[in-house]
Amino acid sequence: MLPINRHRIEVGGPQPYAVEIGSGLLARVRVPERQVALIHPADLPSAFVTAVRAALSPAVTVQVPSRDDCKTLPVFADVLSRLAQVNLPRDAAVVGLGGGAVTDLAGFVAASYLRGVAFYTLPTTLLGMVDAAVGGKTGVNLPEGKNLVGAFWPPRAVWCDTETLATLPHPVFAEGAAEAYKHGLIADPTLLPRILSPDFRPGGPGLEDTLADAIAVKAGVVTRDLTEQGERAFLNFGHTLAHALEAATDHTVPHGEAVGYGMHYAALLSRALGGADLTGHTLAFLRWQRPRPLPPLSFDTVWPYMARDKKADSDGVRFVLLHDLARPYLARVPAKVLRREFDRWWKEVLDFAPVPSADTVPSADTVP
């Protein structure tokens, strides 16, 4: 794990940068570039936008749709046009302010505009802080799947202002906790009880230290393997089914909730292939997360999306599995095992959270 100077994490590699974690960072952010394009989602609290605009005096501010609605080629093209309309120069910077979807989009804009300009990110959700803002993966979705178009474009710096987390309802905060918990399963098991602790909450005494350690896991991985030639693939634990659930439900299942469900499926597969039984850990997280019930699904519904996932190839569907805690590995899992364990997973999901009828699936606003 890379050294942490209190709440500063250094990310190494060809273009090293730092991740700062603390409160009140939005108002204190500074970049060396004289011109800045600020990109933020429509549902971001206006106080956050006001603070960053006062700190950076952007040449252009672009508001985009919220969550994954911004990660489309039409939105991407529209943002590029907005930058071109103000003649933003090559020595300018793009700043992404918001959740992980917006920072993914903003990074891809920065990587593409004038063949690449400086990029900075100010994640305002736990998911954005733990996962999307660190590592340099940027991009947008296609109807055929998530993140199929993009680029590796590391930021110059990341600022995680923990005060922004106080605005998040539990379901949104818990989405980011899923990625942090994943880091505990694949690399740092000390994170597991800390994430489930009452102290891990917005403003809680365990928040910043636990957040820093979760980010440090990913920082260490991407320092050693930026472009996912080896170890970085382990960060996809739980994501093969997660991406399939998102696609099969037309993205009505939020990413972090899909990851929670996907980690339990991966734990079942790990056990089926001879690994330790870690399903107690993944079920404990689901109980803490309290994800919304899934709509009725079958293996045949999600299989086409798993088969076209980036983690699939001509020899089968590749999954990240666990021999034990902090012992991840890659395996191609036969379809018959995937089907059998999906049926087992679905039964446990039903026992955990009964599937509602199609006309009573709760919205994000009605989930406790």
UniProtKB/Swiss-Prot annotation:
> According to the record, how does the cofactor bind?
Binds 1 divalent metal cation per subunit. Can use either Co(2+) or Zn(2+).
Q: What is this protein called?
A: 3-dehydroquinate synthase
Residues reported in the UniProt entry to bind Zn(2+):
179, 239, 255
Look up the record and name the cofactor or cofactors this protein needs.
Co(2+); Zn(2+); NAD(+)
Task: Write one Pfam family the protein is assigned to.
Answer: DHQS_C
Tell me, what does this protein do in biology? Catalyzes the conversion of 3-deoxy-D-arabino-heptulosonate 7-phosphate (DAHP) to dehydroquinate (DHQ).
Got any disulfides in this one, which pairs?
Answer: none
Q: In which pathway does it act?
A: Metabolic intermediate biosynthesis; chorismate biosynthesis; chorismate from D-erythrose 4-phosphate and phosphoenolpyruvate: step 2/7
**At which positions is NAD(+) bound?**
100-104, 124-125, 137, 146, 164-167
Where is this protein found? Cytoplasm
